[in-house]
């Protein structure tokens, strides 16, 4: 053993202050095998500074002989992230590293003092498939000190192993028979938390739960009184997310290092595993909320599964279980949950569709679906987080009669760190949840609103069953972000941290003094008054577009009803008793000159008359400009079409024209000449000088449209007629409006055909040139 023991040279990184305590924090050390002057093998730790994410060794490794290269292991990088509270703390860190002859593993032993009992050390490697099953770890308590020893095999691939020693309580994920490696359970924010009788569960689950309940000393289960259990569904299976510490050390893709190391816990003493002490309040902001489960050695021993919790009610219940187990108290102060009548018809059989957690008697059971294989669709669904999707508050899972396979394991050790961030709050919703929400909305209309005095839990069972999904996300009674406290550290089995700034709490803030039934009635009224919010929550992009179309249709119907009402008032004023239908005749093209406009403008008000006269003069000036300037390039045409259409739509929206449909149809069908004139006609808010400038701008842009001179006067006539009818009839009768729309469509089609023919002639001329 003495021959194999190797000395370690710990060279601190050179820093400006010269303080040795700073080199321990945030430095990288590379283990290099060298040969000493006496011929013995040495392990030398070389400091590696971090510059812009790249690892650069300060000291080059010495050259080894070819005879020793065969037994050389891969380099191991040791990272220390130590938070030194005071300057009096010893800066020296002893890392005795030795290698026995029968093994190629490096054993790193470190002494942890009493002030760092909350330290959790995680061991990671770049290649999990080759060396992960060989990693071994055990801890021994000696007089308040904890000795942590790791056996890290060198990686068989080119990537190097690394060890992360972190003071911020990174959880160590232990292998579980229920879930494969690198996965944990996720309780989503929209999970359903309810209290159901044990008789509603499948028979196999009842046998397991009742068997543990009768053997426990907390209370005997009588035959006449069926106990109630807490049912949490759905529970998803997701992959572990890499923490920020790993990202800082290795700037690799997340997929390469996202899985935690699986530790073989057969050598861990039971008292050490079950009594992990956490320093209160010092939890990493980046560490996920996980349940750490111990590996089961026998078929009926409890197993440990990592779990994330995003549900406030579930966190409250788990915290209550932990407090009861720590204090030795059998009473549980449960949050207000709606219960199901044990004598109800629905409670006889409650088939389970999704994975669920059942909490009873201080123990947590996992109910898995039959034939679930890590559920890859759920994993992809959890990874595709859409921040724009709001969290739905009233998910009622539609249950079916699919058989379930009961996998129940007792929880032995739960260590929870603080939640990572609120990015896991918003989850993409599955199709079954969308359908179930529609069913809930349909059934909710049938439920009578309960009176505030009705507080009997044994009331109508069907209404209670509907209401239980609405009391899921009430504001919890306990303060947000509670911790165990710095001054009074104690042995805890689990600590739950509620999310700060949760979206759920900002939407529903209900006093804790209100009982469950009153809360349910309030929430029922609140949700019935906001169907639009549910529509936006449950709809996809297609449904959103359909909702906008429905909104436009409803606005159109309301406008039409308003027109009918005002039409009836006009008929009363003028003494009309019959419906009149106005027939419009088309004005010939040769009459649509400037003089023809003056005869029509005499009927218009003074403001409109000035505007019309100005438009006529500008139209004549435009014709002259067309005659003078015909030889512009035609490739400018496509560059400005989109810009003009956008300006046209914007002007129509700003000015609030009565005939929005006509202007939109115009901007989509007419070429640029009509669009520019329509812009000038509809911009009533602009001054005369601005209109003149805009007219000249469009005139210079469309010099290539000289062949359309014959249509210019006709188009001005068309637009004048439109403006004329809008000014004289502010509220157009429905029949007249339909006639005008049909006439406009016919004219637009004709203009389109004429201009297409003109463009074709221009193309032929250019081709001939």
Curated annotation (Swiss-Prot):
GO cellular component: Barr body; centriolar satellite; nuclear matrix; nucleoplasm
GO annotation (BP), single: dosage compensation by inactivation of X chromosome
A Gene Ontology molecular function term of the record: nuclear retinoic acid receptor binding
Residue span of motif Nuclear localization signal: 628-631, 642-645
Modification type Phosphothreonine: residues: 732
Compartments where found: Chromosome; Nucleus matrix
Region listing for Disordered, in residue ranges: 378-400, 528-562
Modified residues (Phosphoserine): 402, 430, 436, 502, 599
Motif mapping: PxVxL motif: 580-584
Sequence ranges of Polar residues compositional bias: 378-387
Top-level taxon of the source organism: Eukaryota
Keyword set includes Coiled coil: yes
Assembly and interaction partners: Interacts with RARA. Interacts with SMCHD1; leading to recruitment to inactivated chromosome X in females. Interacts (via PxVxL motif) with HP1 (CBX1/HP1-beta, CBX3/HP1-gamma and CBX5/HP1-alpha).
Family: Belongs to the LRIF1 family.
Related illness: Facioscapulohumeral muscular dystrophy 3, digenic: A form of facioscapulohumeral muscular dystrophy, a degenerative muscle disease characterized by slowly progressive weakness of the muscles of the face, upper-arm, and shoulder girdle. FSHD3 is a digenic form characterized by adult onset of proximal muscle weakness affecting the face, neck, scapular muscles, and upper and lower limbs. Muscle involvement is usually asymmetric, and other muscle groups may become involved with progression of the disease.
Protein name as annotated: Ligand-dependent nuclear receptor-interacting factor 1
Organism of derivation: Homo sapiens (Human)
Gene: LRIF1
